[in-house]
């Protein structure tokens, strides 16, 4: 049955498919035949010629398939009979045997097991046995928990603690020795890589992807248009032409004749229809400007062809019709000119605003990235400079921050030329529109004059026509100036806002860079506490990184502007690679000039501009700077066209707009050093001694002995006269002066005091600090120990002479120490006071 249904479905589908294909293939032929024949005859013809042969084929196929269907039915009957005769008895026998086994063997076993389980349960539930079983189980569980499980868990916990402690120690060692240094090492690399990746995506990948996608879309559109033009349109045109040729030939001929006759009649009848004269008069010559009267007289009339159907009653009628036509056309031009110019201005204004906005966003983003790059690069320079030469570190810091400031300034100056380019584009486009309207009016006038071939000799009529043309010209010019002035004010406001925003962004970037420089400079100076060795081999890596970052972000300045007319001279673009090499060579040459550089860096820096002389080849304006970094900065400066910076703005280099900025504010904002800091504040910041402490107080603090003690008290406390001491004891006096002892007995005792031990450790440390910082102002008060300078002449005369031979006036100045008598009042411990003062400072 299934096979029969399958064949019937195939036959039905085949017949339906055949009928559809037949209809689609021969629809035209059948349609034409169907119009000429009877409906029944057509159906009979279709059945006889198309359906009956296929039906015969289908019947023959069904006849061939009938034996196969019968054989399948017989095979089904044979299989069923075989199952009933052979397989079914065996299945029944196996089922009977399984039931016998379950009833005779499995059931008694289950019954015996249930009985045995019942007996065991009743025995266990007996009172004595249950208590004994409970006690035994409890003892065994207690023994297992106390003697086995708890010790095992204790050992496991101890092992886990030991292993955890070892792991924690190893992790801590790894974290402190490897992880943290690796983090500090790779952090700037990753930051720079991320920044580079962002710049690549923003200015390389995205523009390339946009260009590629645009090209793909344009290619696809071009391919579709080509396919339509080459394949679809010819077919449609062919179908249209065949239909028109077959059915509408007579109608088209009649319509064309009627249209041509009506156009000719309207041209010759009245002047009201001359508004459509450009469709009747065909020019063979194009003139760009209005033709004077003399040129019109020389121009042959044969260059313009007038249809033969057009006739004029007289030259006056022709001229009247031409004047009416020109007046109507001029009125149309005048009425639509204001609207077209306004729309053009609005479009240009919108484009200018978008261009300014895009340039501002790009400029602000690049400025922020440059500041971020400087901050990230100079952060590591502070750590490296703790073991390096601070003079050269500050020098490099100022130099590269100054380079970044100059690059921001260069970018701002380039953006300023956008205003001039936008104005030029607007003026050019408006002028082109006005010229186009003038050419159209002039062409219409020439056509009218040429149509009336004899009117060119009538000077009065020609003057009327010229007066009309001049009236239209004057109106167009006045209206264009009026619209231009109105929209020009709006454009000027947009450009002023644009330049104001550029100035604020550039000033903000410069101030941020200056703040970064000042902050790092103060940190570096505050951390410098002693004279350190040459640091070139330590800081050169960081300097090189700063140079690389400046080079990488200098590529951002080469991004194309959105305004097509914006151009910058090649001679004004600095070659930063060569500048970096010159700066590195200059830094190497300045390593041996530490003192001079350090003094110059702490002096005031001023920024000035000089306008160079204009030459015939190029007008340039050169920016010059004065100060310690003059040589390094001038090498990296570029020149810009004089049109970029007006003369009124040349006095202020960093002024983007002609705004009123005082000289003091400009110096405070863009100076390399904080020159607005008072001298007293600077001394407190960079000096290690409080400059406001009086000299007397400083002597008390840093002097070893209290020099303000009265002389009488000092003589009683610290001096001993020879008359109070026996001569035998006087010879054994241990003099504190650094004298050359010649007495053998004194040399044997070994009590001669070395002069190098006169100063305490704190005084030595402080002297090293003061010597390292070149504190000349406080050196007189620090090294006033025992009046060493005053007693220099005495030490030359004393040598090993006994104290009794020394004059009493000189002996009073000598502070001696006796081993036999100690003053009741001990000396004040000024060394500890000195150490505490030094620590607090």
UniProtKB/Swiss-Prot annotation:
GO cellular component: cell surface; extracellular region
Keyword field: Secreted, Signal
UniProt-annotated location(s): Secreted
Signal sequence range: 1-31
Highest taxon of the lineage: Eukaryota
Principal location class: secreted
UniProt-recorded name of the protein: Uncharacterized protein C21C3.14c
Species in which this protein is naturally found: Schizosaccharomyces pombe (strain 972 / ATCC 24843)
